[in-house]
Every structure is written in C-alpha cells, then in structure tokens.
Amino acid sequence: MFKFNEEKGQLKCSFCGKTQDQVRKLVAGPGVYICDECIELCTEIVEEELGSEEEVEFKDVPKPKEIREILDEYVIGQDQAKKSLAVAVYNHYKRINSNSKVDDVELSKSNISMIGPTGSGKTLLAQTLARILNVPFAIADATSLTEAGYVGEDVENILLKLIQAADYDVEKAEKGIIYIDEIDKVARKSENPSITRDVSGEGVQQALLKILEGTVASVPPQGGRKHPHQEFIQIDTTNILFICGGAFDGIEQIIKRRLGQKVIGFGSDNKHEDLEKEALLSKVLPEDLLRFGLIPEFIGRLPIIASLEPLDEKALVEILTKPKNALVKQYRKMLELDDVELVFEDEALTEIAKKAIERKTGARGLRSIIEGIMLDVMFDLPSREDIEKCVITGKTVTDGEPPRLIMKDGTVVNKDKKTSA
C-alpha cells in the first residue's frame, strides 16, 4: 500500500516515515518506498553481517583430529595419508589466520603431493577436505596443460576454475583449494635436463612454480587464448592450498633401488624384494620424485608428501557399504523409491571387490561393475508392482545369473536357477 502524507499528499519512506521532501532520494517498489538514508543503513548492516560470517568461516578451522574423523566418514582406510592431510590443512589455514607472520617469523606455505595408485581415494580426499572447510574447490588435469605459446590449456586456467567455483568472488577464491590430478604425467622423460623442448613436461612444471609458491596472477575470465582483448582478473595465490596427486607408476622401482643401495652385505636384494608396493610408497622421499622426473624447484614447492596404499579386497568391500555416500546405500535408496528392498549378499560384495582388483581400477571401478550388474534390474523393476525384495548373489556377479526376486506373496523367483552370462 502506498504511503502518503495526509496534509500534503506526499510520498513517505515505508521504513523511517520521512517524506520525499526530507530525503534526497526515494526509491519506489511495488506498493512500497525506501529512502537513500535507509538504503545506506541496510547496506552497512548487510556488509557487517557478511564480513563477520567470512571471518568465522576461516577462523573456526576444525582441529586435525576433527578433520580426520570427518574424512573417515567418506574415505575408507588411508590412515597415514589422512593424518598428514589433516595436519597440513590445519596448519595452512592457521597460517592464513595469523597473516603468515607470528612474532616476525614468516610461516611458509605447505602444498601437498599425494602419491597412490588409481582409485585409491586421492581426489575424494581433496574434495572432502574442501567440503569440511567450506572453501571453493577446483580440480585440474595436468595432462591438459602446456606451457604458454603451445596448443593446450594455460596454467592460469586452473585459477579460473577456482574463481568460477567461488562464483567470481576473488577474495573467497584466494583461500580455496586446487587439486591438480595426474601430476606424474608432467614429469620430464629422463632425470637429466633435455636440450629439446618438453612441451607437456618440464615446461608445465616451470609454469606451475610461480602459482604454487604464491604470486599475483592475471587470469582471463573467458579462458584465455580465444579472447585476447578481455579484462584480466588479478588473484593472489599465496593462500591457495595446492594438492598435487598422481599414481607415479614405476616409482616403487626407484625406491627399491635406493633402499637396496643402503643395505650392506649379502641378501640386500632379497631383503627388499618382499616389500609390498604399499610399504615402498610409504618410504618415498623427495629424491625419488627427482629421479622420477620432477624438477627440484617443483618438488621444493610440495614439501608434504602423503602416500596412499593400494586398496585390498576388505577395504573395497567397506567402501561399497560403510561411507555416508556408499554405492550400495545409493542403489538401495534408488530401488526404495520404487518400493523394492535391495540386498547385496556378502559373497556378492566380495566378488565385486575381486573384479575391481583384477581390473586394477581400485574404488573408481566399483560403480561401473555395479552398474553392469544392476542394469537389467533397474530397467525391469520400475514396471513391476509385485516385487518386494531383490537379492544380488555371488553368482549374479560372477556368472551373470539373474538376481533372486522375492514377490509380495512370498514366492521366490530365480532361487535355484543357474544361467551363464
């Protein structure tokens, strides 16, 4: 309802009641008016509240034990890696809150490198950390990067992804986390520096150095090379946490050689031949990464090394069932929406884990295996209203037998039926 001054018929501010003659500006809305003074007051209140929220967001960083407990809810195993990441992340944001200096002591930045086989949980750990801390998060693939002047993605595009994840709030992006995957793929081809250009290897490492250490980078908001005349966004990377992950296939041989050289006397080879891959990865040192093909300056920017173990059968079964977002829970929920109870027998879960190990895909391959098993079930069951329960057996996984179906009248279908895939 419009507000008028009864004596003069003037419009009034709906908030403070001042007339249009008493204020400089009166802004009209549908049936309501607000003056310039009230707008200014509202702006101050909103800025104060948002400012205090931002402060809380980064000052109330969970303690390392709390971070690890939350990681345990989503990621199975990898205890040592979780501990390393929890401490590193806590110290990183503690450093930001102290403005990088405590009693004139400058706290240096600690980026992280994660070494572990495919499907061991590197990406999931990084994603979960960002979720715990409620900070912007971006994933980049090192294999798509090339140094400036060559066809491919510029290093600055990594920062653009983070800015986009922060809804173009640069200040928020400057406290985010960037996960660079497949970092082992930009290792140079040999330990010795090459005379020829290595477009996708050493050159990319050199290009990444500055943003890893901390610099003010100019980021093209539309992605760079196709729009040369655009305005650049300035972003300071000093407080961005970089996590670089890779499988580093073959690094265990480098570690083995190093350990073998340090054992004196007979049987030095035999002593280390029995070391499992996981045990070897836990003994990785910066010098091993250097021999693998990372340049010394790049290794220096990643002082914390967290090694992840290959997942065994037991861990894969737990991944299927225990985390909050476990695959079995997800599929069970999907069928529950069609009023069907889904049950995976223990033998079925074990066989799914075995298949993932055979394919050498780790946890990453579990979904595609289950998707193959569940395809016919999820195609047929929504059209049927007579089924109460669907049981996935070991034979369903190994031999492709149809799952056992329990009807609403108690009848069991496919109980003893044996068909090959």
Swiss-Prot record:
Sequence positions that bind ATP: 117-124
Gene: clpX
Family the UniProt entry places it in: Belongs to the ClpX chaperone family.
InterPro entries in the cross-refs: AAA+_ATPase, ATP-dep_Clp_protease_ClpX, ATPase_AAA_core, Clp_ATPase_C, Clp_protease_ATP-bd_su_ClpX, ClpX_bact, P-loop_NTPase, Znf_CppX_C4
GO MF entries: ATP binding; ATP hydrolysis activity; ATP-dependent protein folding chaperone; protein dimerization activity; unfolded protein binding; zinc ion binding
Any one GO BP annotation for this protein: proteolysis involved in protein catabolic process
Protein name: ATP-dependent Clp protease ATP-binding subunit ClpX
Keywords attached to this entry: ATP-binding, Chaperone, Metal-binding, Nucleotide-binding, Zinc
Organism: Bacillus licheniformis (strain ATCC 14580 / DSM 13 / JCM 2505 / CCUG 7422 / NBRC 12200 / NCIMB 9375 / NCTC 10341 / NRRL NRS-1264 / Gibson 46)
